[in-house]
Amino acid sequence: MELLRKTHAHACVLVLCTDPCLHPGDHLKDRIQPKTLPIDSGKPQSDAFGTWLALGAEWVTIAKYDDSTLVYLPSQDSFYYASPACVLSPECPKRTVFLGQFVIDSDSTPRVLVHDLVRLQGASFADMPARERYACLQQLGGTLGGICTVQWVGECGVLGKELKSGRFKVPHTVQSVVALTTVPGRVKVVEGVH
């Protein structure tokens, strides 16, 4: 029996972060604790809007506050100043918070797959449909740091079939297909892939 889940937490800190951010501020209100909800057996989720979670991925938020980019690691409940590879561009609106997963690809390349938008210019995106949040995220994709990329999000049923058939390939092991909900950071498992 495996007692500890394998994650990339240590590598995440080394790659994405510099110094801890210990001062108080607006960022403390943006502690996102992502939750993966179990499969809802009563409802078919094949037409749900979602993406995949990588095996061993580490949840991260990347946010712009004044002139700083902060990285929040929910597994450690800690904020850090972003490393140069993760810094958001000056064009990124202040008080904008992105949600993604830190993964290490098969060739040992670290990256952040950003798949949701939590806040834009301080306005909460809670209760906004996932498709609308993703459309806004796509428009802001050019403001992400070099290690970040906008993750593909679409119909879960199609994604699950394509992953299982091998027609849709990603450079890391996929744990599951998940549906985004109206709350950023809350995803429902549609099907396990690993």
PLM features: what roles do these ranges have?
Residues 75-98, 118-148:
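Compact, glycine/acidic-enriched structural inserts
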Residues 2-5, 12-16, 20-22, 26-79, ...:
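Nucleic-acid 5′ end/cap handling module spanning
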